Amino acid sequence: MKTKSFSLAIGLCLALSITAAAKTTVELKDAQGKSVGTAVLWSKTGKGAASGVFIKADLHGLPPGVHAFHFHQKALCEAPDFKSAGPHFNPEAKKHGLENPDGHHAGDMNNFTVNAKGQAKFKVVNKDVTLGDDSHSLFSNGGTALMIHAKADDLKTDPAGNAGDRIACGVITK
């Protein structure tokens, strides 16, 4: 009986060792201040946990088509152009683009598609950022922003992938 109880306790400890370390919900707004949805960001820690930040987006009211999706340097989303968010989050001072042979910004992510009804739901993991207390944290220096661009990112052109105007923005802070 003691062996079974001990085994159960070990199993429970292992199961609990992979837990959500941090979680935040980001509301994204367009240039008119209207909500276009949310993105839930979370990370996991512990033995066997995947690294990075998990993102689950539920968006609406966007133009149909393919759009770029990036983390930007500052936790500011001042309409109408959202330039206040600064450039892409880039703690290692790399060039832009997931296809760049010299590496990419930590804030670079793949494009997503908005359907004909203006909606998009997707999940993605960015393995280059954290929600911790390090230099790659989306909470560092007062926070960052999650940005949606008007066009697709070509995944290689520096500094922003020819992704066009910034059409929606959400502040990421603790």
In which residue ranges do the predicted regions lie?
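Bacterial N-terminal signal peptides that target proteins for export
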Residues: 1-9
